[in-house]
Amino acid sequence: SAQLQPGAKLLVRHELYEDWIKENPYDEGQGWGRVPWCQKEMDVTEEMLDCARRNDVSLVVIGRTAGEDQDNNAKAGSYCLTETEEDMIRRVCEVSKRTVVVLNVGNIIDMSWVEKYRPQAVLYVWQGGQEGGNGVADVLTGKVCACGKLTDTIAADINDYPSTENFGDPFKNYYKEDIYVGYRYFDSHKPFIDYAVQELGKE
C-alpha cells in the first residue's frame, strides 16, 4: 500500500531475504574482540526503486556487526560506508518522496553522506536488544517520540574527535587531549543552538 494506515496489512517478501541468505551466508568476521564489520548488501534493483517511487516513505537500513572490545577502523565497511551502501542511499533518495535511513550499528559511523544525499530522517538504533525491532517500529510509526539526548556525540568528520590524531598505536594510548576525553571535549563547547522554542517580545 502507498499509504500506511492503522491496521493495514503489509506484503512482506520473505522469500527475497530467505533466498539472499542462502546465497550469501552470514559473515562471522573474525569474532569477538575484532574490528566491527558489515554484511554483504543486496544490489538495488529497478523493482525496488519502483516501489520507492510509488510509496510515501522508503526505509534504507545500514548495519554493522559489532566486534566487541574494538573501535572502528576508518575504512569502508567499518567506520565508513561501502560503495554499495552509499549507492543504495543515493539511488533511493533520488526517487523517493521521503527517505528514512535506519542505522543498525553499535558504534558511531561516518555521517558525511547525510549532507550529500539529504534523506528526510536518520534514525540511530544502537544496540536495542531483543525489543530493539519493536522500539524502532514504534518510533517510525509515530507511536513514541524519538527525542532525548544522545549517549554519544556524532561528529561531522572523524578528525573532529581529538583522539583521532593519537589513535592506533598497538602498544600505547596517548591522551594528548588531557582530561578532555570523549564527551568532555564536546561538552567544553557551548551548543550552537537551543532546541527549545524561543520568542522575542517586549517587556
Predicted regions and their residues:
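C-terminal non-catalytic regions of proteins with extracellular/luminal or membrane-system context
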Residues: 1-203
